[in-house]
Structures are given as structure tokens and as C-alpha cells.
Swiss-Prot record:
NADP(+) binds at residues 165-167, 190, 231. NCBIfam families: PRK10792.1, PRK14186.1, PRK14189.1. It catalyses: (6R)-5,10-methylene-5,6,7,8-tetrahydrofolate + NADP(+) = (6R)-5,10-methenyltetrahydrofolate + NADPH; (6R)-5,10-methenyltetrahydrofolate + H2O = (6R)-10-formyltetrahydrofolate + H(+). SUPFAM superfamilies: Aminoacid dehydrogenase-like, N-terminal domain (SSF53223), NAD(P)-binding Rossmann-fold domains (SSF51735). The gene is folD. This is Bifunctional protein FolD. HAMAP family: THF_DHG_CYH (MF_01576). Transmembrane segments: none annotated.
Length: 295
């Protein structure tokens, strides 16, 4: 048995064609969607991620602008930039590339973003709203995973899902989204004792630990769906996920590859959230215009 490969590249390409149509409508009837990215420090991986996001914006027709800050930039300067972007009507989404330099308080910076422009879904209000099923924007990586599961018709209602990872970016929101769809969710970490005893009972496993090849074929049941969010670089320069792909794919029912799995979906859902933010802004502007004309 060999697993069906869940291609993030394929699903992302399909979704991006739909996004282009929404962007075209916005651009023709109102204005071009705009995304601002704040990059602080000189983390090479962050620079690559930001370039990829800016390139995707250009390919789809979203206006983007990157604001680069040196690693020693005071936090107040970054907060001032966010305030300016909050007030800029041509910017509909604001993204702060993580991680930030150690002297900057991430929570304070994220909380400074206007909720209606929080396209990463990390603002405390959006995080709280996600717990009640009413988030304005959903965090992009778990949102992308949910789209992948839906595209391949993988059932969630009543299924046992194990999420390995507890980050605010992936693990926690992933668990909430699976719960929302009726799954029974177990949350583990890379330090969970007897991790295999949990993963072997799972219908769906989401790996998000940053530990290369942590999940092996003896840790899953036959036919399980395995989603690999991890991306790690080995000593020889090769990329791999948190899943030992070659072995696990012979036992799983569905599996995502690394690269070409979850990664393309994360960026695509960021684009989706930016477009939604622009659509919300357009609707608000139209309502305000109608109200103004009635006075």
C-alpha cells in the first residue's frame, strides 16, 4: 500500500485562480488589495519567506510593501510603523514576520495591529474569537491544512485527530479548527511520553514540532492521514519534514510531502485573508458612503 499524496502545490494553484478573480473585481470596482510586511532583523529564513510572499502578491495582483528594520531597531519605531499602516486605507493586511529580535515583545507588536488588518490571525482578539468559532481571520497554516483535508474529502466528524505541537501559530489553532469540525482532538508535543501510543490510535495526525523525521511508520496505524507541517534542513542541505516520509507513505492512507505540501497553502491562505480584508474594507466604505449621503 502506498499513500495518496496530498499536493499542496495543486490545491494552491487551483485556489489562486479563484483569488485572481476576486482581486480583479476589487481592482475594477474599488481598489487593489494591499499587504504590508514588517521584517525586523537579518534572519535568512525570514528574508526568504518574505520574498516568497511578496512574489506571490505580485503574481496574483496584490499590492505589497516590505518594511525592513535592522535587528537593533527600538520596539517603539516598529509600533509607530504599525500605527501608520493601521491608518493607511490602501493597506488592508499587515503581517509581522516572526521571529522578532529578542528585545522586541512579540505580543505587544501583534496586539498593535488593527484587528481588521490582522491577516495572520495572531491578534489576541482573533485568537479568542477562533476559540468560539467566530475569528475574523484564521491563522494561515492550519487554515491551509483544513482546506487540504476538505479538498481530498477526508472526513473529520467523529475522527480522532492527534496534533503534535503546541505553538500559537500552528498547534493550538489547528486543534481548535479540528474541534470545530467535530473531530476528537488530542494535543501532544515532541516531549510527550510514549508519543507513539497516542499517534497509533489516530485517524489524522498533524505534525508541527520542527523535529526532523520524528514520526516513523511504526508510530501510525494503517490508513491514517498524515499532515506534515514541519520543515527542517538536514546536515547535507536537504529539506525534510517532521515525518519520515519514505517509510510512512507506505503505511498511511494520505500524506503531505515536504516540500510541496503545507507550505504553498500557508502563503495562499495569507493571500486569501488579505483579499477578505480588502472585501470587508470595501463593504464598510460602501455602508459609510450610503450613510453619509442620507445625512
Amino acid at each position: 500500500m502506498s499513500a495518496t499524496i496530498i499536493s499542496g502545490n495543486f490545491i494552491a494553484s487551483k485556489l489562486r485562480e479563484e483569488l485572481k478573480q476576486r482581486i480583479r473585481i476589487l481592482s475594477e470596482t474599488w481598489m487593489q488589495p494591499g499587504l504590508a510586511v514588517i521584517l525586523a532583523g537579518d534572519n535568512p529564513a525570514s528574508s526568504v519567506y518574505v520574498r516568497n510572499k511578496a512574489r506571490t502578491c505580485g503574481e496574483l495582483g496584490i499590492h505589497s510593501k516590505v518594511f525592513n528594520f535592522s535587528a537593533d531597531t527600538p520596539q517603539k519605531i516598529i509600533l509607530r510603523q504599525i500605527q501608520d499602516l493601521n491608518a493607511n486605507p490602501e493597506i488592508h493586511g499587515i503581517l509581522v514576520q516572526l521571529p522578532l529580535p529578542s528585545h522586541i515583545q512579540m505580543n505587544e507588536v501583534i496586539a498593535a495591529i488593527a484587528i481588521e488588518k490582522d491577516v495572520d490571525g495572531f491578534h489576541p482578539c482573533n485568537v479568542g474569537a477562533l476559540a468560539t468559532g467566530h475569528a475574523l481571520f484564521r491563522p494561515c497554516t492550519p487554515f491551509g491544512v483544513m482546506k487540504m483535508l476538505a479538498e481530498y474529502g477526508i472526513p473529520l466528524q467523529g475522527q480522532h485527530a492527534v496534533v503534535v505541537g503546541r505553538s500559537n501559530i500552528v498547534g493550538k489553532p489547528m486543534a481548535l479548527m479540528l474541534l470545530e469540525q467535530g473531530a476528537t482532538v488530542t494535543i501532544c508535543t515532541s516531549q510527550t511520553r510514549e508519543l507513539a501510543s497516542h499517534t497509533r490510535s489516530a485517524d489524522i495526525i498533524v505534525m508541527a514540532t520542527g523535529k526532523a523525521n520524528l514520526l516513523t511508520s511504526d508510530m501510525i496505524r494503517t490508513g491514517a492521514t498524515v499532515i506534515d507541517v514541519g520543515i527542517n534542513r538536514l546536515a547535507d542541505g536537504q529539506l525534510c519534514g517532521d515525518v519520515e516520509f519514505s517509510g510512512v507513505k507506505e503505511k498511511a492512507g494520505y500524506i503531505t510531502p515536504v516540500p510541496g505540501g503545507v507550505g504553498p497553502m500557508t502563503i495562499t491562505m495569507l493571500m486569501n485573508n488579505t483579499i477578505e480584508a480588502a472585501e470587508h474594507a470595501k463593504a464598510k466604505a460602501q455602508i459609510e458612503a450610503r450613510c453619509g449621503s442620507m445625512q
